[in-house]
């Protein structure tokens, strides 16, 4: 785990609440607007930022994030420009961890060694690469860890106790528990099942466990945050951005403020989570 990531989780745990992890697609709807969104997230209460890298074949993404990726690609967003987003953000914010989330193909084409060097220079703290299983750790995970970049793995309801140790073997930063099988943006499952799943993962690792896929409202964040170390919100933010755009997909005056308002509400939800659990 990078020092910045470790410090952020420790600081938030000391406050007695879960971490709020916010995802958005880099370059959606354009570079400058997404930079403004990224800069607004911590001010609205985000603790960790997941910065999406657009890809033409995003197999794990639901319709909303697929459309966000298409908008970003249409606007000219690339992996290099996504690293530039991180670099520009990091010049003003030294404390908020950045996790790049995407697929292996753009990294492979960019060049693994070059990518990792540029990611370190840009201030990236972690990676989530959804199509690289543990059996392929030598491709990117191990080199990333050697550079000091966390490699965050996804666990799902179908990850059984035989598979889980392999998934966790080289995981660092935090574990991302996908609270349902399927694609992003699905409905939220039974909270009691999530609490049991978090406890099961924690019996195998000392890493924080963050829960995502399906978290859309402050109430969702409050319920999930009662048992998880962190709450991940993505589709709701992407939908908020999309709803603010013109029919042509261009930014409006409501785009950034709309995201800020949503994240402030989600932040209030995670801050109420442990209070609700204690009642």
Curated annotation (Swiss-Prot):
Keywords: Amino-acid biosynthesis, Aromatic amino acid biosynthesis, Lyase, Tryptophan biosynthesis. It comes from the Bacteria. The alpha subunit is responsible for the aldol cleavage of indoleglycerol phosphate to indole and glyceraldehyde 3-phosphate. PROSITE patterns: TRP_SYNTHASE_ALPHA. This is Tryptophan synthase alpha chain. The gene is trpA. Belongs to the TrpA family. SUPFAM superfamilies: Ribulose-phoshate binding barrel. It catalyses: (1S,2R)-1-C-(indol-3-yl)glycerol 3-phosphate + L-serine = D-glyceraldehyde 3-phosphate + L-tryptophan + H2O.
